[in-house]
Amino acid sequence: MTDSQTLLADYVNHGSESAFREVVVRHLDLVYSVSVRLVGGDTHLAEDVAQTVFMDLARMAKSLSREVRVGGWLHRHTCFVAAKTMRGERRRQNREGQEDLE
């Protein structure tokens, strides 16, 4: 079985969609479960977070260090994206609450 770093390198070097798909399959449960926990159980927001995380991985894969542990990077990036998403949600809810008062 090939490790995630090798699969990601195959995606970067050869554009292998199947390699990237395998990385997603291997780590989707981790990313989604962390997302659900951090967005307070909102499964729709968690799906948005997970999608953003994997899109970011695809976009940033070339710039990631060869020594980076994909699972660790995904966990940390999921925490970052979930926090950013929740800040945006709070701002949106505050705006909507203020509009209701007017």
Q: Which ranges hold each PLM region?
A:
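Arg/Lys-rich amphipathic alpha helix in sigma70-family domain 2
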Residues: R59-E67, R76-G97
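Structural recognition of an alpha-helix C-terminal capping motif at a helix-to-coil junction
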Residues: D48-M55, V68-F80
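Short, charged helix-capping/linker segments at alpha-helix termini
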Residues: V12-E22, Y32-T52, S63-V68
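Generic alpha-helical segment signature
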Residues: M1-S4, V24-V25, A46, H75, ...
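Amphipathic alpha-helical segments in well-ordered regions
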Residues: R26-L30, V34, W73, H77, ...
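N-terminal module of bacterial RNA polymerase sigma factors
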Residues: M1-L30, G97-L101
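Hydrophobic side chains within well-formed alpha-helices
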Residues: L7, A19-F20, V49, V70, ...
